[in-house]
Amino acid sequence: MGLETEKADVQLFMDDDSYSHHSGVDYGDPEKFVDSGQDRDPHRLNSHLKVGFEDVIAEPMNMHSFDKVWICSHALFEISKYVIYKFLTVFLAIPLAFTAGILFATLSCLHIWIIMPFVKTCLMVLPSVQTIWRSVTDVIIAPLCTSIGRICSSVSLQVSHD
């Protein structure tokens, strides 16, 4: 009872002259780009999103639905996941890619032209600030702490048991 899964063996036969021998992607021919089978997540950023039917729906051994229900629900899950994803990417992928491009371009510009020069300026000025801070602590804070220490050292407590 349940869905039996088999691994299919798929082979692709191509003539030597039907594809280009260079390793780059030819963006001029959209048909080759669509069917290139390239890895669109080479750094595995979204490996956690590879969710199958068995990862979401699971029936214990003693509780099984009818085989037809299981097969139909599995098929409906996969089809709806595929169709809804394609539908959402048609409407959202280009605007979100454009927005993300603007965001990352803005952040890169701010980092390159504002943040890093500010950090480098602070690091250049820091030795001077360190010298001034050491002088301030030697002239003001050290004598103040020494005086407070001498005052507190002369305090004595006597405990009497009555």
Swiss-Prot record:
Compartmental location: Nucleus; Cytoplasm; Golgi apparatus membrane; Cell membrane
InterPro entries named in the record: Caveolin, Caveolin_CS
Family: Belongs to the caveolin family.
Protein name (database record): Caveolin-2
PTMs per UniProt: Phosphorylated on serine and tyrosine residues. CAV1 promotes phosphorylation on Ser-23 which then targets the complex to the plasma membrane, lipid rafts and caveolae. Phosphorylation on Ser-36 appears to modulate mitosis in endothelial cells. Phosphorylation on both Tyr-19 and Tyr-27 is required for insulin-induced 'Ser-727' phosphorylation of STAT3 and its activation. Phosphorylation on Tyr-19 is required for insulin-induced phosphorylation of MAPK1 and DNA binding of STAT3. Tyrosine phosphorylation is induced by both EGF and insulin (By. similarity).
Function: May act as a scaffolding protein within caveolar membranes. Interacts directly with G-protein alpha subunits and can functionally regulate their activity. Acts as an accessory protein in conjunction with CAV1 in targeting to lipid rafts and driving caveolae formation. The Ser-36 phosphorylated form has a role in modulating mitosis in endothelial cells. Positive regulator of cellular mitogenesis of the MAPK signaling pathway. Required for the insulin-stimulated nuclear translocation and activation of MAPK1 and STAT3, and the subsequent regulation of cell cycle progression.
Residues with the Phosphotyrosine modification: Y19, Y27
